Amino acid sequence: MPQDRFVASDSIASRVQQLVDEINRHNRLYYDDAAPEITDLQYDQLLAELTQLENDHPDLRRPDSPTQLVGGDVVDQLVQVPHRVPMLSIDNTYSREELAAAMERIEKSLEGESVAWTMEYKIDGVAGSIRYENGELTLALTRGNGQVGDDITHNVRTIRELPRSIADAALAHPEVAGGNVPEVLEVRGELYMTDADLADLNVRQTDAGHEPFKNTRNVTAGTIRLLDPKIAASRNIRFFCHGSGELVGVRASDHMTFLQHVQALGIPIAPDVVRFENKEDALQAIAKLELEMPDLPFEIDGIVFKVDSFEQREKLGVRSKSPRWVIAYKFERYEAITTLEAIDVQVGKTGTITPVAYLTPVDIADTTVSRASLHNADEIERLDVRVGDTVVVEKAGKIIPKVVRVEKHARTKPLPKFEFPTHCPQCDEVLTRDEGGVYIRCTNPACPAQLRQRLVYFGSRTGMDIDGLGEEVVDLLLQKELVENYADLYRLNVDELAELTWPRLRKGKGDEMIEVQFGRKNAESLVAGINESRTRGLARVLSSISIRHIGPRVAKLITAKFWNLDLLRSAKAEDLAAIHEIGDRIAESLVKFIHSESGSQTLSDLDAVGVTMSETEPVATPDEEANLPLAGKNIVATGTLQHYTRDEIKARIEELGGRAASSVSKKTDFLIAGEKAGSKLTKAESLGVEVLSEDDFRLRYETEAT
């Protein structure tokens, strides 16, 4: 009899393991790949069997069990737990001058060493620390006071993007921990909610008769501290890793390598992290990030700069509340009080009807603000804002000013409510609400206001970056009926443009508007700018032609896998949704556009006029990068090379999976030495770093790569 009990126990343990693995596989198929293999009823039956077995045998309940993911036990209270490594805050600067001075001080502390910097968005969420022990997620904490945080493990387990176990991934990626499972991996990052998820949540709130949430940060902070994980599971809180706490058995000598390792383990990392060899390049890149901010799917309140090298971080050390190797350039929130003079509605490039507040001009953060966003009809209703009201206007993270509240005590007389239009103000099409009920749109593809906005965006710096194609020129081309779509721009010629006339203001006694010829010089400049944009590539095209939810970053992620027009047209929604960070909403929007009559025609027309509808080559995935010849290697090139320029050798090293460094150190795997190699060669030899000639490098690695 005792033997029978042991056999039964082994059999039950085996069945539990089988169910956990099987249900987790179905979760990935359903949530990540959008390709379920079983019905909801079959899934529920498997989950019910596992739940019953775990209730009967609690000792067999595994940390990665799907029963621990959603609908775990309600906790009685949040328990405070000490951080193994203090979770410090970041010092802030509020101007580029302050930022440059802070970075200069940091570099001076390293006494002349070359310093590489990383730059990333400062996501406006809630700081969190997530701990894996021997590959299993065991603990998640808030920052708290930096020394002690609240245990929010029950809620963090509901984040579907976050793996409960990293053991298999660690074994599959030996560069992370030498082929072992890390004893301790503690990732630090930001818990947050996207703008779209907040909009969806607020629809549910309103339908249930509850007040909508004001912003993503507040709802995130409240949600992760709830005692019932079922509520957290319903709100789609997400996580980005941007740093580390305690690490035991993890191989990484710098921040960028650490993030690559974390990503290989399936943990989401902060988006668009960029490494620069010096602070000057990093500071210059701020402008580019600011251009992309309005298209981000989440709120940010600054940009963070970090010393990349862990060795240099150790030298710099920490203060009582913050590390000395990181500094934030923060967008301070500025407010001002003014009067709402009028509300108008604008038609966007995808047909979205956006209400705009016209204000008595007021100075905010050295900028005169006379217009501000009111977002949508629901926001007008929530604020109960009316023409004539005294309002508070805020200018912060994403630059665009917005009305945040009404000073109702200053409303001394009755003011009429704003009536949102039922028809498009430009084409008189009946307006419709999205399925989610948040946005109101004009669905007329021939709406002239949409065409104008689409063409303006197409020519903008974040679009195809066409010099000379601004709002006035777009208005002129539309007025003269020279363009009806994007492809028409590429059919324009200098002669017909030069003969156009447009109204200009003549200064002088009694200013007046006169008709002035566009002229050959303007025409040649515009046509040259249009022609130059032909080779921007497929990612740039996709993000420029006003497809809903497809901005520059999303387009890059998609074209890394579907890198030409044929591949893109053959892609199914589930194929696109399987790409990390894409999801069903974006995938369905793109597929709908590609296979619609107007969308298909747009792509074909651009292809026909010679616009490049592909990327040079597909970008390697993290798995593919790990198999490249120089994966994980730090390489320095010095001296005059015969077959490469400085930029070409750097690009080639990176194409082969390596990291092109600017200075020699103990971390350097090898030095490529050309003629007149100089001091870097001397230093490499003194440190025992391997030295390759240019021919050695070509023979060893160019052959491997072909």
Swiss-Prot record:
Coiled coil: none annotated. It is an enzyme of class 6 (ligase). The active site is at 122 (n6-amp-lysine intermediate). Its EC number is 6.5.1.2. Keywords: DNA damage, DNA repair, DNA replication, Ligase, Magnesium, Manganese, Metal-binding, NAD, Zinc. Its cofactor is Mg(2+); Mn(2+). The keyword Metal-binding applies. InterPro entries: BRCT_dom (IPR001357), BRCT_dom_sf (IPR036420), DisA/LigA_HHH (IPR041663), DNA_ligase (IPR001679), DNA_ligase_AS (IPR018239), DNA_ligase_CS (IPR033136), DNAligase_adenylation (IPR013839), DNAligase_N (IPR013840). GO terms for biological process: DNA repair; DNA replication. It catalyses: NAD(+) + (deoxyribonucleotide)n-3'-hydroxyl + 5'-phospho-(deoxyribonucleotide)m = (deoxyribonucleotide)n+m + AMP + beta-nicotinamide D-nucleotide. Transmembrane segments: none annotated. Residues 625-706 form the BRCT domain. NAD(+) binds at residues 40-44, 89-90, 120, 143, 190, 306, 330. This is DNA ligase. It comes from Rhodopirellula baltica (strain DSM 10527 / NCIMB 13988 / SH1). The gene is ligA.
